[in-house]
């Protein structure tokens, strides 16, 4: 059972009773908590958890409880903006803004060809938005340049699943976490990124002692502190760790030989790649003591059930897809997949990033179709009533490739939808410079760092002001009902896309409007027809069922289907050539394989085991930049704080960026708690206060990525490298080289000055000065001596939030 009891979390501001509660789903992380939106006098005034929803039983995380404040923010955009000749954004009508975009799109296609418009969307929209965008982009604009910020967070999910199983869709679900004996989290700080899921894990663990919890993370996160076993590895050594652990399992013959023989291919090649990976070698590269590695290997080799989860700590690391494929390999060689309590659960970060992949809003065609398979292209052409030869095909291009094309003058229009890319992209100064070379459209509810580089800004509706479906991390389709009208002058993403299609006069091959639906529900009904017979079949889903049954996990092939708690329970995988979503890629170079290369392997419905080669991160600490840098989330904020920064509660909990540094590293440099320091990498620098402790290992710095104004130099992505994984093309945010320096002022002691006097002048304490100068007494310094003055001592609170609040 998932929960011992329900607990209705509620955050509401209302004078008297609310007018109504509207069915909804949280729009923050990928857990997909059911909730109700409070409405009074036509405004959203609160939220409460849905006690009947199986995912959360009424619980909400701190971000989810406070998301509605953004709807009422006084700085909402309520009119389009167009940049004038003087370089200033000024108000414009919707007609003027949309006509300008349509005119620019037509001009770009005429001058540069069809593959010259880049559409870069989000993981926070609705399935209906993504499907509409996919149809407009591919069948209307004939562009293959469709990507989203999901490339930054969870692209590796898709590609590791394609490599191993032939199709997207994570095999396990949250239900399996409730049954498993062993839960292993790879780079997944669930206590801060998915607080309700963490509560669900801890609820069971406190009641039953299960699951045995293994956490793989270079930091001592809140999650790691609850682990039975914390594998605190060197940054970028995930594959080195997995190779050793899996090699040990194979060596000890703790594998399911019948499952391997009947349901997989490639075991010999995989085993050969691990032949020279004793645990001693893993110890060398990971820094984890061999005794700890032996304990982990024994647990993985003997557990009767196993769920693994992965998130950005793995996805944003060197050789991310190889690491996730190795995790799939582990499940396959032990036969722990498609069974209750077992399977890989490759997580998502955003509330609907999975839906963007499913609906075709990013690299692949809708409903997990293979753009390298002519039969699949013909299917979608028939469904859309367009000529197959007009649909763009070929390898998908990630956002970093889009930026390179912009730099070369190959992209004439960049449409940025629902994401603050000028803060979230790696090496952001490069991205900012590139935007000056193209026409930029930004679709967002607020002015952001990205609207600062826009030529046109479109004010978009927020959650609660529109209707549609989302897909969470475990394939559950959830419904969001519209609770209120958006502010006057604001349109939903869906409405904007329909408007654009009309102004572009997009037609099917019979001359009828390409977009034949007018509402989100009509759009969903069309997508159901597109999904029929595919791995993500949603034929049996309706809006009514989603509300009545509190979500359904695909596939749901007919109206009597209750949904599918886990995939591959029949051990039949999507690797038949006519079924596969992809023919795969070369595991090391990322080159797309041909249909013949795939067919020659003869997978025929069997899962594919791959060799896993360890390659160290492309950038490593050196003499000039001697420290590792990694980035990540805080429990209080979401992405770049566009929404959470407008909640007074969340903003006050974490108002500014900082850097975590190990106590010993700080002591060597006489850095004191809260003082301003400068972090520099080969790409840029930031100045943030120091948070000192043992949350990071020696030689590693951690900077949260939420903060990024152009005025304050505190954006983590001023520092991060833009190397990408060769298969998923996901940037490697988690490993960059950097250095840290004190930002201080020298003060020469004058006659009559005391340390107390100097401390008061700079707003410091005597203890601050003593610590910064390695003094034991205020009398250890004399007239003429020079004191180092640490600037801007800032109170950086040590994490006060307990994820499960002691009450689960």
Regions found by a protein language model. Give the residues of each.
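N-terminal export/assembly segments and adjacent metallocofactor-ligating motifs
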Residues: 1-252, 262, 289, 293, ...
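N-terminal leader/propeptide and maturation segments of large enzyme subunits in energy/redox metabolism
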Residues: 85-90, 252-290, 368-391, 484-592, ...
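Conserved short loop/turn motifs at secondary-structure junctions
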Residues: 118-126, 284-288, 311-318, 350, ...
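Extended redox/cofactor-interaction regions of prokaryotic respiratory oxidoreductases
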Residues: 131-202, 209-214, 239-243, 284, ...
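Glycine/threonine-rich phosphate-binding loop and adjacent beta-strand/alpha-helix elements that clamp
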Residues: 174, 465-486, 496-497, 501, ...
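Short beta-alpha connecting loops at secondary-structure transitions
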Residues: 225-233, 459-461, 465, 476-487, ...
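Long, contiguous, secondary-structure-rich segments that constitute the structural scaffold
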Residues: 487-489, 493-558, 624, 640, ...
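Primarily a LysM-type cell-wall glycan-binding module
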Residues: 744-767, 782-797
């Amino acid at each position: 059972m998932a929960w011992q009891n329900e607990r209705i979390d509620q955050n509401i501001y209302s004078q008297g009773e609310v007018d109504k509660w509207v069915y909804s789903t949280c729009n923050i992380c990928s857990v997909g908590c059911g909730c109700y939106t409070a409405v009074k006098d036509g405004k959203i005034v609160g939220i409460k958890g849905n006690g009947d929803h199986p995912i959360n039983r009424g619980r909400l995380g701190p971000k989810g409880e406070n998301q509605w404040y953004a709807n009422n923010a006084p700085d909402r955009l309520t009119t389009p903006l167009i940049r004038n000749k003087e370089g200033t954004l000024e108000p414009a009508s919707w007609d003027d803004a949309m006509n300008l975009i349509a005119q620019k799109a037509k001009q770009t296609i005429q001058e540069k060809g069809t593959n010259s418009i880049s559409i870069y969307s989000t993981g926070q929209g609705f399935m209906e938005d993504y499907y509409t965008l996919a149809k407009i982009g591919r069948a209307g604009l004939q562009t293959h340049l469709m990507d989203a910020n999901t490339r930054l967070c969870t692209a590796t999910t898709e590609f590791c699943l394609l490599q191993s199983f032939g199709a997207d869709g994570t095999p396990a679900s949250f239900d399996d976490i409730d049954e498993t004996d062993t839960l292993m989290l790879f780079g997944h700080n669930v206590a801060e990124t998915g607080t309700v899921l963490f509560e669900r894990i801890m609820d069971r663990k406190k009641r039953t002692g299960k699951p045995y919890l293994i956490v793989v993370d270079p930091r001592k996160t809140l999650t790691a502190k609850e682990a039975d076993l914390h594998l605190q590895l060197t940054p970028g050594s995930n594959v080195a760790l997995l190779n050793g652990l899996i090699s040990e399992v194979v060596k000890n013959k703790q594998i399911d030989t019948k499952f391997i023989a009947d349901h997989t291919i490639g075991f010999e090649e995989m085993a050969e790649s691990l032949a020279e990976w004793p645990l001693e070698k893993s110890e060398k590269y990971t820094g984890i003591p061999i005794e700890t590695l032996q304990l982990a290997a024994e647990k993985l080799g003997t557990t009767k059930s196993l769920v693994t989860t992965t998130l950005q700590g793995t996805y944003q690391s060197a050789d991310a897809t190889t690491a996730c494929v190795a995790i799939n390999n582990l499940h396959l060689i032990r036969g722990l997949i498609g069974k209750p309590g077992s399977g890989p659960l490759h997580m998502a970060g955003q509330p609907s990033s999975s839906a963007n992949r499913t609906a075709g809003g990013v690299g692949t065609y809708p409903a997990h179709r293979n753009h390298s398979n002519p039969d699949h292209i013909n299917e979608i052409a028939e469904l859309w009533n367009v000529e197959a030869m007009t649909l763009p095909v070929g390898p998908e291009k990630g956002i970093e490739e889009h930026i390179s094309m912009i730099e070369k003058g190959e992209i004439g229009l960049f449409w940025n939808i629902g994401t603050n890319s000028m803060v979230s992209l790696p090496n952001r100064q490069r991205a900012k410079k590139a935007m000056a070379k193209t026409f930029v459209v930004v679709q967002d509810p607020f002015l952001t760092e990205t609207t600062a580089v826009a030529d046109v800004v479109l004010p978009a509706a927020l959650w609660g002001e529109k209707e549609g479906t989302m897909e969470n991390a475990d394939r559950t389709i959830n419904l969001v009902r519209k609770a209120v009208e958006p502010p006057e002058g604001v349109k939903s993403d869906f409405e904007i896309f329909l408007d654009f299609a009309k102004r572009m006069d997009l037609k099917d091959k019979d001359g009828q409007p390409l977009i034949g639906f007018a509402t989100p529900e009509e759009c969903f009904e069309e997508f159901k027809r597109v999904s029929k017979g595919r791995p993500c079949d949603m034929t049996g889903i309706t809006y009514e069922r989603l509300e009545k049954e509190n979500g359904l996990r695909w596939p749901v092939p007919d109206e009597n289907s209750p949904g599918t708690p886990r995939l591959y329970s029949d051990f039949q995988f999507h690797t038949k050539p006519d079924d596969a979503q992809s023919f795969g890629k070369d595991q090391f170079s990322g080159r797309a394989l041909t249909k013949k290369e795939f067919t020659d392997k003869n997978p025929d419905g069997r899962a594919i085991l791959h060799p896993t080669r360890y390659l160290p991160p492309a950038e490593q600490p050196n003499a000039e930049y001697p420290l590792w840098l990694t980035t990540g989330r805080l429990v209080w904020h979401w992405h770049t704080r566009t929404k959470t920064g407008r909640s007074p509660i969340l903003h006050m909990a974490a108002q500014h960026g900082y850097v975590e540094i190990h106590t010993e590293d700080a002591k060597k440099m006489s850095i004191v708690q809260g003082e301003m320091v400068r972090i520099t990498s080969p790409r840029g620098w930031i100045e943030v206060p120091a948070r000192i402790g043992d949350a990071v290992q020696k030689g590693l710095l951690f900077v949260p990525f939420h903060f990024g104004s152009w005025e304050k130099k505190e954006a983590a992505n001023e520092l991060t490298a833009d190397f990408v994984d060769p298969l998923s093309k996901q940037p490697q945010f988690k490993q960059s080289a950097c250095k840290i320096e004190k930002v201080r002022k020298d003060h020469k002691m004058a006659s009559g000055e005391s340390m107390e006097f100097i401390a008061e002048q700079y707003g410091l304490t005597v203890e601050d000065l003593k610590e910064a100068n390695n003094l034991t007494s205020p009398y250890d310094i004399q007239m003429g001596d020079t004191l180092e003055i640490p600037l801007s001592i800032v109170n950086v609170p040590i994490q006060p939030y307990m994820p499960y609040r002691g009450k689960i």
